[in-house]
Amino acid sequence: INICLITKKELKDSNSYLAQGGISVCRGKEDREDYIEDTLIAGHYKNDRKAVEILVDESEEAVKTLIEMGVKFTGDKKGLFYTREGGHRKFRILYCEDRTGKYIMESLIKKVLEKKNIKIIENCEFLDIIEENNNCLGIVAKNKEIFSIKSKFTVLATGGIGGIYKNTTNFSHIRGDGIAAAIRHNIELKDISYVQIHPTTFYAKDNERKFLISESVRGEGAVLLNQKFQRFTDELKPRDEVTRAILEEMKKDKSEYEWLDFSTIKLDIEKRFPNIYKQLIKKDINVL
C-alpha cells in the first residue's frame, strides 16, 4: 500500500512532540481493574468502557512496540522507572526524562522515514475533502499551490482546537482543520465538546505559546499554593478538577496566577526534569 502523509508544518511540529510527562501502562493483571476504574473516574463515567478496556489491555504491548522501535524510557539495569500523574492511584507512567513526546515522536518519525512506500509532504495545508456521491475520494491541499490527492482511504489525524486559545501550550497551527472539514461534509463526530485543559503552565503575559509544566512534576511531589502560600487542592486529582480548583483560587485571590512549589520534590530536580529546569533558568527561575 502506498501512503501519502501531509503535515501542516514540519513532522515534529505536533502537540505529541511537546508532551512531557509520560505514557501510562498497565502494571500487570493485578492492576487491570484499578487502571480501568481510575480512567472511568477521571472521565466521570462518560467514557466508552469498551474503549477503556482496549486501552488498558493493549497498553503493555504498545509500550513493548515503542521500545522495539527505539524509544528509550528512563530506567536503570534493574528496570524501567515509573512516575504518577493525576487520576492515577498508582505509579504507572513510563517516561523519557521530561520530554517523553519528543523521544517517542523522533523514534516514530525515524521509522516512517525508513519506509519507501510512505511519501511525506511537509508545510502542506489540508483544505478540504473531495466528496462524490457521499464517498470520500481524497483531499484538496495547499503546498505553495493548491492540488488534490486521490486515495481509496483518507485518515484525518489533524489534532484538536488548542491553537485557537489565547493561552495554550499547543502549537498555534493546531486549529481543528480536520474537525471543520468533517462538519462541512456531515461526517459524524463524537465528544467534540470535550477540550482538555492542562492545569499548569509557566505564567507569562505575552501571546506566545505557553511553556508546559509537566503533570509529573506534581506526581513527584510539587504542590500548588495560593497567594498566601497555602496549599488548596489535591494536586493529583484528574486534570479538569485541578484546573477548576486553580481557577476558583485565582478568583478568590483576585490573581492571574497561583504558585507551584518545587521544594517538596525529593528527587534530583535537575536530573529528573532537565528540560523544565533549563527552560525555567532561561526565565530567571531557579527551582533548586
Q: What would you call each of these model-derived segments?
A:
Residues 11, 181, 187-288:
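An anion/pyrophosphate-binding glycine-rich loop and adjacent beta-alpha core
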Residues 25-55:
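Glycine-rich active-site loop/strand segments that organize a redox cofactor
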